[in-house]
Amino acid sequence: MVKTCKNQQGIKNANRDAKRKLKRDCDLVAVLLTMEQMANNLGLVWSIKNHAKELYKKAEGSRVFRGRRRHSRASMVACLYLACQEEEFPRIVKEMQSVSGGAKEKNKHINKVIGVFKKHFQVGRNYGKTQALDLGERLCTNLLALTTMSSKL
Protein backbone atom coordinates (compact mmCIF):
# COMPACT_ATOMS: atom_id res chain seq x y z
CA MET A 1 0.00 0.00 0.00
CA VAL A 2 2.83 2.40 0.81
CA LYS A 3 4.44 1.76 -2.58
CA THR A 4 1.22 2.72 -4.32
CA CYS A 5 1.10 6.04 -2.48
CA LYS A 6 4.70 6.75 -3.39
CA ASN A 7 4.02 5.86 -7.02
CA GLN A 8 0.98 8.09 -7.11
CA GLN A 9 3.01 10.91 -5.61
CA GLY A 10 5.69 10.32 -8.24
CA ILE A 11 3.08 10.43 -10.99
CA LYS A 12 1.69 13.68 -9.60
CA ASN A 13 5.17 15.20 -9.54
CA ALA A 14 5.85 13.99 -13.07
CA ASN A 15 2.59 15.52 -14.27
CA ARG A 16 3.40 18.77 -12.49
CA ASP A 17 6.86 18.87 -14.07
CA ALA A 18 5.40 18.16 -17.50
CA LYS A 19 2.86 20.95 -17.08
CA ARG A 20 5.59 23.38 -16.03
CA LYS A 21 7.72 22.46 -19.01
CA LEU A 22 4.76 22.85 -21.35
CA LYS A 23 3.95 26.26 -19.87
CA ARG A 24 7.60 27.34 -20.23
CA ASP A 25 7.58 26.26 -23.87
CA CYS A 26 4.30 28.09 -24.54
CA ASP A 27 5.68 31.22 -22.89
CA LEU A 28 8.83 31.03 -25.01
CA VAL A 29 6.79 30.69 -28.21
CA ALA A 30 4.68 33.71 -27.21
CA VAL A 31 7.81 35.78 -26.53
CA LEU A 32 9.37 34.80 -29.85
CA LEU A 33 6.20 35.75 -31.70
CA THR A 34 6.15 39.11 -29.94
CA MET A 35 9.79 39.67 -30.89
CA GLU A 36 8.95 38.77 -34.48
CA GLN A 37 6.17 41.35 -34.50
CA MET A 38 8.47 44.01 -33.03
CA ALA A 39 11.10 43.26 -35.66
CA ASN A 40 8.51 43.47 -38.43
CA ASN A 41 7.38 46.86 -37.12
CA LEU A 42 10.99 48.05 -37.30
CA GLY A 43 11.45 46.57 -40.76
CA LEU A 44 14.34 44.30 -39.78
CA VAL A 45 15.63 41.53 -42.01
CA TRP A 46 15.20 37.84 -41.15
CA SER A 47 18.86 37.34 -40.14
CA ILE A 48 18.51 39.94 -37.38
CA LYS A 49 15.21 38.42 -36.25
CA ASN A 50 16.78 34.97 -35.99
CA HIS A 51 19.86 36.30 -34.21
CA ALA A 52 17.69 38.10 -31.66
CA LYS A 53 15.67 34.94 -31.07
CA GLU A 54 18.86 32.95 -30.53
CA LEU A 55 20.09 35.54 -28.02
CA TYR A 56 16.82 35.30 -26.12
CA LYS A 57 16.89 31.48 -26.09
CA LYS A 58 20.50 31.59 -24.90
CA ALA A 59 19.56 33.96 -22.07
CA GLU A 60 16.55 31.84 -21.15
CA GLY A 61 18.70 28.70 -21.06
CA SER A 62 21.41 30.22 -18.89
CA ARG A 63 18.84 31.77 -16.53
CA VAL A 64 19.93 35.37 -17.00
CA PHE A 65 16.40 36.51 -16.17
CA ARG A 66 16.37 34.91 -12.74
CA GLY A 67 15.10 37.42 -10.20
CA ARG A 68 13.75 39.71 -12.90
CA ARG A 69 10.56 39.80 -14.84
CA ARG A 70 11.32 37.00 -17.25
CA HIS A 71 9.29 38.00 -20.24
CA SER A 72 9.46 41.75 -20.00
CA ARG A 73 9.49 43.73 -23.18
CA ALA A 74 12.79 45.30 -22.11
CA SER A 75 14.55 41.95 -22.51
CA MET A 76 13.00 41.47 -25.96
CA VAL A 77 14.06 44.96 -27.02
CA ALA A 78 17.58 44.37 -25.68
CA CYS A 79 17.89 41.20 -27.76
CA LEU A 80 16.75 43.04 -30.89
CA TYR A 81 19.12 45.93 -30.17
CA LEU A 82 22.15 43.68 -29.68
CA ALA A 83 21.28 41.60 -32.73
CA CYS A 84 21.16 44.80 -34.79
CA GLN A 85 24.55 45.83 -33.43
CA GLU A 86 26.13 42.47 -34.18
CA GLU A 87 24.70 42.32 -37.69
CA GLU A 88 26.08 45.85 -38.29
CA PHE A 89 22.62 47.32 -38.82
CA PRO A 90 22.74 50.03 -36.16
CA ARG A 91 19.66 51.24 -34.34
CA ILE A 92 19.25 53.55 -31.39
CA VAL A 93 17.47 52.60 -28.19
CA LYS A 94 14.74 55.19 -28.82
CA GLU A 95 13.79 53.41 -32.06
CA MET A 96 13.60 50.13 -30.23
CA GLN A 97 11.55 51.72 -27.47
CA SER A 98 8.98 52.87 -30.02
CA VAL A 99 7.96 49.26 -30.75
CA SER A 100 8.13 48.10 -27.15
CA GLY A 101 5.04 49.93 -26.07
CA GLY A 102 6.66 53.30 -25.42
CA ALA A 103 5.77 54.40 -21.91
CA LYS A 104 5.77 50.86 -20.52
CA GLU A 105 9.46 50.27 -20.96
CA LYS A 106 11.68 53.21 -20.11
CA ASN A 107 15.14 53.66 -21.55
CA LYS A 108 16.71 52.97 -18.17
CA HIS A 109 15.14 49.49 -18.00
CA ILE A 110 16.19 48.70 -21.55
CA ASN A 111 19.74 49.94 -20.95
CA LYS A 112 19.95 47.91 -17.74
CA VAL A 113 18.98 44.72 -19.57
CA ILE A 114 21.42 45.50 -22.39
CA GLY A 115 24.16 45.83 -19.76
CA VAL A 116 23.21 42.47 -18.24
CA PHE A 117 23.34 40.80 -21.64
CA LYS A 118 26.71 42.34 -22.46
CA LYS A 119 28.09 41.22 -19.11
CA HIS A 120 26.88 37.62 -19.40
CA PHE A 121 27.51 36.92 -23.08
CA GLN A 122 30.19 39.41 -24.15
CA VAL A 123 28.04 40.56 -27.05
CA GLY A 124 28.19 43.98 -28.64
CA ARG A 125 31.65 44.72 -27.22
CA ASN A 126 33.69 45.28 -30.37
CA TYR A 127 31.11 47.25 -32.29
CA GLY A 128 31.25 50.97 -32.77
CA LYS A 129 28.57 53.42 -31.85
CA THR A 130 25.71 54.24 -34.14
CA GLN A 131 26.84 56.80 -36.69
CA ALA A 132 24.69 59.76 -37.70
CA LEU A 133 25.16 58.92 -41.39
CA ASP A 134 23.55 55.51 -40.92
CA LEU A 135 20.54 57.03 -39.21
CA GLY A 136 20.25 59.89 -41.69
CA GLU A 137 20.30 57.54 -44.66
CA ARG A 138 17.60 55.32 -43.22
CA LEU A 139 15.36 58.17 -42.07
CA CYS A 140 15.68 60.06 -45.36
CA THR A 141 14.70 56.90 -47.23
CA ASN A 142 11.61 56.63 -45.04
CA LEU A 143 10.74 60.29 -45.69
CA LEU A 144 11.15 59.82 -49.43
CA ALA A 145 8.80 56.84 -49.33
CA LEU A 146 6.24 58.86 -47.36
CA THR A 147 6.34 61.81 -49.77
CA THR A 148 5.88 59.56 -52.80
CA MET A 149 2.95 57.83 -51.11
CA SER A 150 1.30 61.13 -50.18
CA SER A 151 1.75 62.51 -53.70
CA LYS A 152 0.01 59.43 -55.14
CA LEU A 153 -2.96 59.95 -52.84
What does each model-identified segment do?
Residues 1-153:
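Non-catalytic, interaction-prone regions of core transcription and DNA-replication machinery
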